[in-house]
């Protein structure tokens, strides 16, 4: 599905990603953890080819990748409905307003209002809802739980699990360890641009203990 080989990225001479290697398979959910500035968002932006990088990234179906940025952006004077319609048209998907309305019964968004006037949580819900209306083989979600209320988190987790059942590949980042252990098959910890630990079948407490050891080692150097 997605293979990353020797991925490196520098900004103004500073190394942000250092020889990263991953293999992400279909039908699995992958979590990426790391402190602020560890390189998580840069990794995702490289996967989406929004950044230049050294190394190789190969994707089975490069035109069927969905992406949720950690910083929602909307043009001025575009309503929630217009944003959805624009994204669907860009993906050559027919607009089914009945389907949109039915899905919005769960999200409860004022689609007639300008999206720039939405709260951060509402903007995040609008972007997630738009992704749900499209058919992707690979979905990359950068801090998707940030700004969501409990209902939004539940809806998002249900959708992620559904995509896994459909054989999709999902990669997401979060600072909330339990949010990842609840749904992820594998979790990686990035520190200073390097993957320093991988976890499978570990509880949130076990991962926190392991990460604490790494953090103490790094701060003592």
Task: Give names to the regions the model predicted.
Residues 2, 17-19:
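Conserved structural motif at the start of ABC-family nucleotide-binding domains
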Residues 150-151:
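Helix N-cap at the start of a conserved alpha-helix in ABC-type nucleotide-binding domains
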Residues 139-143:
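Catalytic Walker B motif of ABC-type/P-loop ATPase nucleotide-binding domains
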Residues 33-35:
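The feature captures the beta-strand-to-loop junction immediately N-terminal to the Walker
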Residues 103-119:
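Conserved ABC nucleotide-binding domain
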Residues 173-175:
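H-loop/switch region of ABC-family ATPase nucleotide-binding domains
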Residues 71, 77-91:
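Q-loop/switch helix immediately C-terminal to the Walker
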């Amino acid at each position: 599905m997605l293979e990353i080989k020797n991925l490196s990225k520098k900004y103004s001479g500073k190394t942000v990603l250092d020889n990263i290697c991953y293999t992400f398979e279909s039908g699995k959910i992958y979590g990426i953890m790391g402190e602020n500035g560890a390189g998580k968002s840069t990794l995702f932006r490289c996967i989406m080819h929004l950044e230049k990088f050294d190394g190789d990234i190969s994707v089975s179906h490069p035109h069927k990748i969905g992406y949720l940025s950690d910083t929602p952006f909307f043009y001025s004077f575009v309503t929630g409905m217009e944003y959805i319609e624009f994204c669907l048209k860009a993906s050559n998907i027919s607009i089914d307003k009945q389907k949109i309305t039915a899905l919005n019964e769960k999200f409860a968004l004022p689609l007639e209002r300008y999206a720039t006037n939405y709260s951060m949580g509402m903007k995040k819900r609008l972007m997630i809802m738009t992704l749900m209306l499209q058919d992707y083989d690979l979905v990359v979600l950068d801090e998707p739980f940030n700004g969501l209320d409990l209902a939004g988190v539940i809806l998002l987790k249900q959708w992620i699990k559904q995509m896994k059942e459909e054989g999709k590949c999902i990669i997401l980042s979060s600072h909330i360890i339990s949010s990842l252990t609840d749904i992820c098959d594998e979790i990686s910890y990035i520190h200073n641009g390097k993957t320093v630990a991988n976890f499978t079948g570990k509880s949130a407490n076990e991962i926190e203990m392991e990460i604490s050891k790494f953090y103490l080692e790094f701060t003592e150097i």
